[in-house]
Regions:
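Alpha-helical transmembrane bundles and membrane-interface segments of multipass inner-membrane proteins
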Residues: 1-153
Length: 153
């Protein structure tokens, strides 16, 4: 189940990015809810919030190391992990893999989901992989805080 969820996240992420490239690239943002939600094509050559721009090699090495470490941990401890820990790892691996594929293929990550928050603050544009990574991080932090996640190696 964990592997299937990981693959589903990667497929959904990559298909949504292909659609963004086809229908949003070189076009005005597609407004869904005025002054709140739009689809806007962005080529992100950095990390979250645009930090570390043009550090492709760095991101490839770090992402690959994280994917290897987390995957090995998951395989080694699969039988003792609870379902929420497995969910967190599936989301993390799926999201990281989706953005990793972009960095290898294009040299940047395709982002396209855009929200304007209070006082028209433009929240950084993101994608499905980013959502999976953020949700996994929140879930894993929650599990660690409430002692539902055992770290063993």
């Amino acid at each position: 189940v964990t592997f299937i969820l990981t693959i589903m996240i990667v497929i959904l992420d990559q298909l949504s990015k292909l659609a963004a490239i086809r229908y949003l690239k070189d076009k005005k943002p597609y407004i869904i809810i005025d002054n709140f939600f739009q689809l806007h094509y962005v080529e992100n050559r950095g990390a979250a919030f645009g930090i570390l721009q043009h550090k492709r090699g760095f991101f490839i090495v770090i992402t690959l190391a994280i994917l290897i470490f987390v995957s090995l941990y998951l395989v080694k401890h699969y039988d003792i992990l609870n379902k929420f820990s497995k969910l967190g790892f599936a989301l993390l691996i799926g999201g990281a893999t989706g953005n990793f594929i972009d960095r290898i293929r294009f040299g940047y990550v395709v982002d396209f989901i855009s929200f304007k928050l209070i006082n028209r603050y433009d929240f950084p544009v993101f994608n499905i992989a980013d959502i999976a990574i953020v949700v996994s991080t929140i879930l894993i932090v929650f599990l660690v805080m409430f002692d539902k996640f055992e770290v063993r190696w």
